[in-house]
Amino acid sequence: MASLKLQAVTKSYDGITPVIKQIDLDVADGEFIVMVGPSGCGKSTLLRMVAGLERTTSGDIYIDNQRVTDLEPKDRGIAMVFQNYALYPHMSVFDNMAYGLKIRGFGKEQIRQRVDEAARILELEPLLKRKPRELSGGQRQRVAMGRAIVREPAVFLFDEPLSNLDAKLRVQMRLELQQLHRRLKTTSLYVTHDQVEAMTLAQRVIVMNKGVAEQIGTPSEVYQRPASLFVASFIGSPAMNLFAGSVSADGCAFILSDGVRLPLETPRPQWADRRLTLGIRPEHIQQTTSALGVPMALLTLELLGADNLAHGRWGGQSIIARLSHEEMPAAGSVLYLSLPPAALHFFDSDSGLRMES
């Protein structure tokens, strides 16, 4: 195992436009970190810099407390798993897994021992003589992981390894990756655009946006206390409801853009002169009686089996509430909703940052 450290790392291809703005990250021995964000946010570029496939514009990278910023990929003690498997079609599973060791001059017996052990861990033993074309997508991805495992790297790097698999197989492979990490305990940096992968695999999540690490924290921290409007809107399915507005002069109510007032449990007069955004997750909205709740005109109801999603309008803006599977109001009806004060989030609309009490 090894630690991984990124110190003030930046990347720009033209010397003017930053692709990666200053990133600082400390990954502990054996930690599993997931970088998540939309396409083009810089997560794969950052991973490639750790691998040595891209040069940093500034800053340094350390693996096991050794500066590797200028080292070639082969000298960094890393192994990378790609989304397209990158298997040699004319080679057997055994030879694909062994190839990297052969070109590094390992002996036949050492190669056999390492490949056999990786095949046992990944349940590939019956497939070692097959060619990649004879394997399923999930089996090919396990071979790609096996090729990384036999190198016994200090750090595993994963670049969207499950993106080419169908939904059912992605679930299976997520479980296998969790089990693999528990067994090997190798420091891992994983890139995905899929927030479900991020939340289920990570010990800590890095939410990337336009080359910036918007938030670094545990899955629970990122979900329960998003640091910015971007994190609030990106993490969660469906996303957090967000309502533009402002706080009244006395600080006792949040006023939506169309004048609807929502009483605040704790007065916040210090926020009265700011443009704010209120957020609440769909599962935290509760149905209540008309005397206590705010009315929502129901537009559509999504039946998901375990629960239902009610889509409507409130305060002139769209809102989604997660209801139990037993609650099935008709489209066009009016629901009365309660927004518990403890479940409310507030953000500065101009900076996008979370407001702290």
Model-based region annotation:
Residues 59-67:
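Conserved ABC transporter NBD signature motif
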Residues 73-230:
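ABC ATPase nucleotide-binding domains
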Residues 51:
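Helix-to-loop junction immediately C-terminal to a conserved catalytic motif
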Residues 5, 26, 62, 336-338:
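ABC ATPase nucleotide-binding domain
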